[in-house]
From Swiss-Prot:
Principal location class: plastid
Top-level taxon in the UniProt lineage: Eukaryota
Identification of the protein by name: Maltose excess protein 1-like, chloroplastic
Function: Probable maltose transporter. Essential for the conversion of starch to sucrose in leaves at night, probably via the export of maltose from the chloroplast.
Organism: Oryza sativa subsp. japonica
Keywords of the record: Chloroplast, Maltose metabolism, Membrane, Plastid, Plastid inner membrane, Transit peptide, Transmembrane, Transmembrane helix, Transport
GO biological process: maltose metabolic process
One Gene Ontology MF term: maltose transmembrane transporter activity
Length: 399
């Protein structure tokens, strides 16, 4: 990948040749150079659009040569070869995250299948279909976000997440744990979401249809997120659908105003980014709810699987290098949060209550810190920065 060169401000007219004082006085009536003639203001008889386009073409034609532009710019420290190597490696890391994420759902799918074959439908009622539906909506939102950015590895991760979660939901519907109308509506949304994201990824989808889909997941995500957060503390606060209704109504109003052009450019961009951030916050809230449950019922910690938490930490950790490399703050926030809180945080709770050994916890902690250090070190080299702090600043505040 070629390094970018900082732009220089070009003069409106080409600079005259440099002469000594004597030569300039002797040739005072010197004829203008072809470049000067070419960039003279055009006749006012030509249309304004034609004059501006032609003038722009001539400015580009007689612009400073590349050597002059390069000489006035800052030196580029980035090594193209190392940049491309790290680009390819981070993409492979993101793709490899499919393995731990798929292993997270397979045990539940196999267990549900065994119970269904044995006729034990009651066992599937222990799996909350509303929670699975929430995760499915989060996967669809993130799938749309990464499909728009053409991040192949992340697209595959989210697609497998949608499919595996939908399989569990289908099993719950077969056990009559999930009502049939909700399952039919969910199936329609999943089919439409996968089809639209597939078409958009390959550039085969009209922009109008994609905007409608983005509006749908924005409103749906903003309606679900506050409701899930509210439901976490239901034993201590009254059970109510009001948070979801209010948030969904506000989201619908914001989307309509953005499409009607009633918002500023910054407001429109903010509304456009809501679906991705909503899905990220939704996944970020899940480990918070788990740790809140651990706090209320410490005895439940014995039922947690250390292997499951380790898979969650590894899967999210594998996506951190790619998020840092492309300077995607939303992706980095979600992956780092899940890796630390959902994975390492729950392992820390299990260690505090003697569910896992000290050696296992320390080895996991050391491995996670070593991985983060390796990520920042390689990213610093790839981008040609002087220190990892510079990479973090670019991630948080942009270049």
């Amino acid at each position: 990948m070629s390094s970018s060169v900082s732009s220089v401000r070009l003069p409106l007219r080409a600079a005259p040749p440099l002469y000594g004082r004597r030569e300039w006085r002797a040739d005072g009536a010197r004829a203008p150079s072809p470049a000067l003639v070419a960039v003279k203001p055009l006749s006012c008889r030509a249309p304004a659009s034609y004059r501006s386009a032609l003038l722009l073409h001539r400015r580009r034609r007689y612009a400073l040569p590349p050597v002059a532009a390069t000489a006035t710019s800052k030196p580029v420290l980035k090594d193209p070869k190392k940049y491309q190597e790290w680009d390819s490696l981070t993409a492979k890391f993101a793709g490899a995250a499919n393995v731990p994420f798929l292993l997270l759902q397979l045990p539940q799918i196999i267990l549900n299948a065994r119970n269904l074959l044995a006729g034990n439908k009651t066992a599937l009622f222990a799996v909350p279909w509303l929670g699975m539906l929430t995760g499915l909506l989060g996967n669809l939102s993130l799938l749309s976000y990464f499909a728009k950015k053409k991040e192949t590895g992340a697209v595959i991760v989210q697609t497998l997440g949608v499919i595996s979660t939908y399989v569990v939901i289908a099993q719950l519907a077969m056990a009559e744990s999930m009502p049939l109308p909700q399952f039919v509506a969910t199936s329609a949304v999943v089919a439409a979401g996968l089809l639209l994201n597939f078409l958009n990824y390959f550039g085969w989808l009209p922009g109008t249809l994609w905007l409608l889909w983005e509006d749908f997941i924005t409103i749906g995500g903003l309606a679900v997120l506050p409701q899930v957060m509210w439901s976490t503390f239901v034993p201590f606060i009254p059970n109510s659908l009001l948070p979801g209704i209010i948030s969904g109504s506000l989201a619908a109003t914001a989307v309509v105003m953005a499409r009607m052009g009633k918002l500023s450019k910054g407001g429109i961009n903010f509304v456009g980014s809501l679906s991705g951030w909503t899905a990220t916050l939704l996944f970020m809230w899940m480990p918070v709810a788990q740790m809140w449950t651990n706090y209320l019922n410490p005895s439940n910690i014995k039922g947690l699987s250390a292997f499951t938490m380790l898979l969650a930490m590894i899967g999210n950790g594998l996506m951190i290098p790619r998020a840092v490399f492309i300077r995607d703050l939303m992706w980095f926030t979600g992956s780092a949060w899940a890796s630390f809180l959902q994975g390492w945080g729950n392992l820390a709770c299990m260690y505090c209550f003697d569910s896992i050994s000290r050696e296992s916890f320390l080895a996991t902690t050391f491995g996670l810190l070593l991985w983060l250090g390796f990520t920042l070190w390689r990213d610093t080299i790839a981008h040609g920065n002087s220190s990892p702090v510079t990479s973090l600043k670019e991630l948080l505040f942009g270049k």
